[in-house]
Amino acid sequence: MPSEAVLGQELLDERRTETRRYKLRFPTREALEASLAIEAVGGAVAVALPERRVISLDVPAAQVSFMAESFEAARQHYGAEIVEDYRYSLEQLDFYNPLAFAPEGEAQQSLDDVIEAIGAPQAWSHSRGEGVVIAIVDTGIDGLRPEFPHYKRHPRSWAANGEDPWTDWQGHGSMCAAIAAGTRSQGGEFDGVAPDAMIMSCRTHFYDTELAAIYDELTSLAREGATVIASNSFGVQSGSPPPVPADSDFIPALDDAIAAGVIVCFSAGNYHHLAGGTPDGHEPNSIWLHKGRSDLLTVGAAKPDGSMWYYSSRGPGQFPGQPLTSPKPDLVGITPPFGRVVYGSNVSVLKDGWGTSGCCPQAAGLIALLQSKRHAEDEPPLSRDQLFDVIRKSSVSLGHHGHSQGAGRLDCEAAVNRI
């Protein structure tokens, strides 16, 4: 039977689906602090960003009209600007659908096979990720899974007010964490790419303000001297170019984190078929928004046989040729059909693989191996540009157009041997 804590978390998650999230931006920090009494009249503060002069409120759907008076008071008395908090989509296939999962007996390959195919075990003689923090910006991580023992959990793991980062509201975040840095050391079923890396769970519902708060925390860690890698598997689920989100705090926070030295990986997206692309086609473009930036690594998805997954988003990115962009994806990971992997509290078999979501943490784990090797040799960490150059140049071409595969399939052994 689920514990009371688990049941309470499930109720919280259910309540989240019945709320609206609003962002309130104030002219000064003092105005923000004075306004927090608004919580007493129907809204619960989910995130506070005092340095950015922003709070976000969860408002039960039934109370939205009631809150109009309170919002108007916030405008008049505190100068607040009020907008609905932008929400990104979980980078998923149809993981909410039970038909996306298959019985254990239908498994063709598992995470072990993927780890072997990308050369991670061969790299472990040089490095296993020690001394590096991998932040999993996702749906949380199931702390009951033995792949995530307490000694691997970063003490500054993050969740919105009232939530626990070591619970997973969907299952997806546990999958990404296991791929990047799960361990068998305490009875886990799988090792990830970097099994000795520290894991920082950053549990989010993908609201702009939550992502800003997470990246502000990652910035602080990096400025304090931590080696931080962020794995992100969310985006905008669309077959056509989405508009740039207005009034974003996440993008400025992302800028700050990258400037502070956080190495950022993003899944390319699972939108190629939504854009009308054929499985073997390298167009049209379906990599959206910030995933085209040159200062982050964008990762697509191939099958173990080297063919591209039908859904893996193709480049070159939404804003090709603009300043600070580069052709995308940078590379691909691999994910098997009917692949067996941690998903939430269970080990499950996913018919259509793990999406680009399951490939992004492979790249994050590889970066952890590279930086950890530098630590072990008493050498300074590689710069972002050095890391990306090593990873691209050591990747194995699968024979596809660059808009599909980038530089090719990542190779942990070759990358570690290159530095």
Model segments located where?
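Autoinhibitory propeptides
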Residues: 3-4, 12, 32-114, 121-122, ...
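Short glycine-/aliphatic-rich beta-strand segments at the starts of folded cytosolic domains
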Residues: 8-26
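Active-site-proximal beta-strand/loop segments in catalytic clefts of secreted hydrolases
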Residues: 26-27, 85-86, 137-140, 179-183, ...
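Anion (oxyanion) recognition and catalysis
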Residues: 39, 76, 128, 255-259, ...
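Subtilisin-like serine protease catalytic core
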Residues: 122-155, 163-210, 225-227, 259, ...
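Extracellular S/T/G-rich loop segment that most often corresponds to the catalytic His/Ser-adjacent loop
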Residues: 138-140, 146, 286-372
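Hydrolase catalytic cores
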Residues: 180, 200-204, 335-405
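Substrate-binding/access-modulating region of protease and related hydrolase catalytic domains
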Residues: 183, 202-295, 326, 345-361, ...
